[in-house]
Amino acid sequence: IAHMGLHEKVCQMMFVNPENLVLSHDVTKLDKEFKSALKKYPVGGIMLKSKNIQTKKQLKKLLKKMQDNSDITLFLAVDEEGGTVSRVMQKLGNIDGGDIGSMYDYRNLGGDIAYENARQIGDNLSYYGFNLDFAPVADVWSNPGNTVIGKRAYSNIYSEAAELIPYAVRGFHAGGVLCTLKHFPGHGNTKEDSHYGNAYVYETKDDLENNEFQSFRAGIDAGADFVMVGHMIVTDISNIPSDLSKEIVTDILRTELGFSGVIITDSLQMESITD
């Protein structure tokens, strides 16, 4: 970092979709326009979506070419949680065989299953060339009316999620990828979906400490590499989205919870931010 110029340092803070660099078309290969954009904007990471994925051979080639043509090693990421949020395995299958459903459906089967599911996901991602997964979901489905998290969560019970998340973290690592706890400080008790507007958390800070933070603390202690901070507004702490809040990001996540890894925002294209 000491040898980087200001432009490089700013670009390194950006995690983008390929289409943020190539505005004219969906990216499925490293064409001239994409290659030039990577050189001009040395971003820190690139996240692929389903539209960027066609075949096993195509995906491996795309990821390798992106990495080979970046002067600074890229984080290459995807949303691969299992179940409904699956960009790679839903399209290309599981190289280890079988299907992996929503994590919530395995909640009564113990930590070894949470580990094995995460390991298989990691196996698949690292096979193609990804080095980071935006998973596991550390939110707890505590509000039955919550639709944005739902069965993406490992449990609807705080203590149970806190038991399972460390197994998942270790499983992803065993599969060869870094992992991300999301969506801090907890999106499972909201009524609203932050994809489509402001989502509010009405719990007090003490409530969060005793409830939502359990699974995040457990994941951090297990060695999670990234924490994704969501756009939820915690009314007891701040009147702005959590990922813009010093109280949430610096005072609580970095200082109180002691997380020293990479902190990343949720997508800045979501309506809770763009509106």
What annotation goes with each model-predicted range?
Residues L38-K39, S126, I220, T255:
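Non-catalytic positions within long, well-ordered alpha-helices that form the structural scaffold/packing
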Residues I1-L21, K39:
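Mature N-terminal segment immediately following signal peptide/propeptide cleavage
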Residues D99-F130, A135-V169, H173:
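A substrate-binding/cap region within the structured catalytic cores of diverse enzymes
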Residues I53-F75, G82, N108-G129:
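Active-site-adjacent structural elements in enzyme catalytic domains
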Residues C11-P18, G44-L48, L74-E80, L132-P136, ...:
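Hydrophobic faces of well-ordered beta-strands that scaffold small-molecule active sites
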Residues S36-S50:
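A short aromatic-anchored loop/beta-hairpin motif
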Residues E80-T84, V140-N143:
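Acidic helix-start/capping segments at beta-turn-to-alpha-helix junctions
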Residues G5, L23-E33, N52-Q67, L74, ...:
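Second-shell residues forming the walls of enzyme active-site clefts
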